[in-house]
Amino acid sequence: MFDFTGKTALVTGASRGIGRAIAVALAKGGASVALNYAGNEAAAAEALELVQRAGAPRAKLYRFDVADPAACNQAVEDVVADLGGLHVLVNNAGIAVDQLVMRVKDEDWNRQLQVNLTGAFNLTRAVTRPMMKARGGAIVNLTSVVGEMGNAGQAAYAATKAGLIGLTKSVARELASRNVRVNAVAPGYIETDMTAALPEAAKTKLQELIPLARLGTAEDVANAVAFLASDLASYVTGEVLRVNGGMYM
Amino acid sequence: MTTANVEQKVKNIIADQLGVGEDEIKITSSFIEDLGADSLDIVELVMAMEEEFEVEIPDEEAENIKTVQDAVNYITTHKK
């Protein structure tokens, strides 16, 4: 559906869940894909195979911590050299450590901020020069419905996701003159490992809040990301595209 | 490196970054007024010069580098 022929994409947190589905969706469009992952080797190998089978001309795994700025700079350099340029960046890597605010530990707050928000910043800064030089590029940040709504038990996670919206809009303004577009996708409740942990009763209750009356799939989100990353979205920048079944409008 | 060398290299960088012909770049040329640079171009120029000459150009100094001459002066006085 979307044409990424001749393009290279870097997807963070690509070994599982939404990130994996995004990597596959971009590969289906003909993109070469760099898959970042934090440490789950088995899942990463599986994701790589799916991406290759989906039709990526070239695909490669890159294990690094997005919270480490030096590692991000190095990774971007490596991807450009290995896969021929870098045209699409998808900041998807994220962690959630749910706790009521009075019980949030400093290290959990800091780690969520580092991975979810600083990680996206690190890579955005690193890709800016190659994309500006190429006079074009697309960055898609994965935020969340809770970044706009808030959620009890997710003060830190929601704060990082709200922060990503500010990052998205600011960088969209900075880089627009170079035809680098920056957008965000805000998923609602999606069936992934992250939400599988929820008790059944909680899931049923959630579904009542969703007009489309089901949890989303990783593919639902991946399709929205692929659109924003593609040339079909050439006049879209600074946008937050909600993919939530209507639970927040 | 002589001042003439620095000047030539600075001109190369400017030509590359801004996509202008080297013959259009005079020592007195202002990046913004004469060479059509915008704020992003200036940041890119500063970063390219930092890399080429292995000098650090702090933001508050970069603000004062407005012409080719300013850049050459800064580099020749700060280069190790």
From Swiss-Prot, chain B:
Pathway: Lipid metabolism; fatty acid biosynthesis
Post-translational modification: 4'-phosphopantetheine is transferred from CoA to a specific serine of apo-ACP by AcpS. This modification is essential for activity because fatty acids are bound in thioester linkage to the sulfhydryl of the prosthetic group.
GO cellular component term, pick one: cytosol
Keyword Lipid metabolism applies: yes
Modified residues (O-(pantetheine 4'-phosphoryl)serine): 39
GO terms (BP aspect): lipid A biosynthetic process
Localisation: Cytoplasm
Main location: cytoplasm
Location of the Carrier domain: 4-79
Keywords tagged on the record: Cytoplasm, Fatty acid biosynthesis, Fatty acid metabolism, Lipid biosynthesis, Lipid metabolism, Phosphopantetheine, Phosphoprotein
Entry keyword 4Fe-4S: no
A molecular function (GO) term: acyl binding
InterPro entries reported in the protein's UniProt record: ACP (IPR003231), ACP-like_sf (IPR036736), PP-bd_ACP (IPR009081), Ppantetheine_attach_site (IPR006162)
Pfam families reported in the protein's UniProt record: PP-binding
PANTHER family: ACYL CARRIER PROTEIN (PTHR20863), CARRIER DOMAIN-CONTAINING PROTEIN (PTHR20863:SF76)
Protein family per UniProt: Belongs to the acyl carrier protein (ACP) family.
Function in brief: Carrier of the growing fatty acid chain in fatty acid biosynthesis.
Protein known as: Acyl carrier protein
Lineage, opening ranks: Bacteria, Pseudomonadati, Myxococcota, Myxococcia, Myxococcales
